[in-house]
Structures are given as C-alpha cells and as structure tokens.
C-alpha cells in the first residue's frame, strides 16, 4: 500500500522501491515517470553467449562517499529508466548513457538537452517528509545474474547502502 509506505518515509524511514513497472499512483505522487521494459530470457542467453558490448551504468552519487565509477551490465537488465523527475528535488545516484545509440544525431542539441534526455537516471533518492524514498528502475540487477557478474556487486551494495543502518526487508 503506497499510503502506508509514504507514511513510514514521512516519519523518517527510508524506503527502497526497485521495479521496472511502478504504479501510476506512485509515479503521480512522487512526480516521476519510468519507462517499462519486457525481459526475455532467450535474449539474455543469446547475448551472454556472444562477445557483444555491455551497457554502462554510471555511479554519479555523492563522490565524498563513493567515487564515480562505471559498471557494465547486460543490456537486457538496463532497459528501464526514469524519464521525468524534475518537478521535485532528487539526489541522483546512477544514470545510463543512451546517447551512444544515437550516433551523430545529437550533434545539433545543447548539452542540457542531451544530458536530460540521453543520460536518464536509473537510481535516485526522493526526499519525503523526514525520510527518503530510494527509487531504482533496474530490478534484474538485484538477481544472481546481476550480482554475480564480474564486479557489479559493488553497484548493488552502493544502492543498498542508501538505507544506512536501517533494517532491509525484501518483499
């Protein structure tokens, strides 16, 4: 129940929501929009067996806590991202680079437009009352495929560290 979660955050708790499909009510309440992606295991199997390039997720969170770093994941895990989140304050954690797929088509655009539209966030923190809501659009990164792949567990631990000393309950 969204109301119950937001009341917890309002009282000072930290809530982490990891999904590639958030409810419209949650998106409207927290003023964000997330793309939806469909996962096909067949595509992952084909991709994993090849030597194709992986997608990059850039850690852009507080550099005093963690240095900026690039993590490489199978593209099938990084298809969802936040398109709109500007109307309320957010703390940016991680973004994906969509500009590489556009080639020279972006040459005519200014850097602000490119940054906003082609470097969308995949993880962010939205303040809510006395607490926070951590939003992550890449749930498949939290599976064994994502955690056990190369050095990517570091990315997952950085996301989870946003909860701090509070207990983590997975549902």
Task: Label every PLM stretch briefly.
Residues 21-23, 97-99, 140-142:
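Short acidic/polar capping segments at secondary-structure boundaries
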Residues 140-171:
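Extracellular ligand-binding/catalytic regions of CAZymes and related secreted enzymes
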Residues 50-129, 134:
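Catalytic beta-strand/loop cores that center a nucleophilic Ser/Cys/Thr
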